[in-house]
């Protein structure tokens, strides 16, 4: 629910940004963009924070949208959120332990000689599987 609300707010902010008057500036008024950059730099300075907020023009204010960090992680992996949740659920199922009886063989199709010579990784060393 929270992700969908954040996505809607983010999309709305992008949609409104496309239709602001600042996007339709004629080429003759490009010098004003440098003036707006200076205004933005002055807003970020600490000296402006001490002044009265009424002194800042209302037309130069911008909305900054911060997304949830979990959403960005999912975007970097390239998988949609619903597929990641399904994969995580599948991973939990894959990590379940299977118990075997002691008298069960590994496989009836493997001969006893071959089974005894098979090697299993124990730590950093390969040892015969029957020693494990």
Swiss-Prot record:
Molecular function in Gene Ontology: melanin-concentrating hormone activity; type 1 melanin-concentrating hormone receptor binding
Cellular-component GO terms for this entry: synapse
Alphabetical UniProt keywords: Cleavage on pair of basic residues, Disulfide bond, Hormone, Neuropeptide, Signal
An individual GO BP term: neuropeptide signaling pathway
Pfam family, one: Pro-MCH
Tissue expression per record: Pituitary gland. Produced in neurons of lateral basal hypothalamus which project both to the brain and to the neural lobe of the pituitary gland from where MCH is released.
Keyword Disulfide bond in annotation: yes
Taxonomy, superkingdom: Eukaryota
Disulfide partners: 120-129
Signal peptide limits: 1-24
Family from the record: Belongs to the MCH family.
Biological role stated in the UniProt entry: Plays a role in skin pigmentation by antagonizing the action of melanotropin alpha. Induces melanin concentration within the melanophores. May participate in the control of the hypothalamo-pituitary adrenal gland axis by inhibiting the release of ACTH.
Name of the protein in question: Pro-MCH 1
Organism: Oncorhynchus kisutch (Coho salmon)
Phylogenetic classification of the source organism: Eukaryota, Metazoa, Chordata, Craniata, Vertebrata
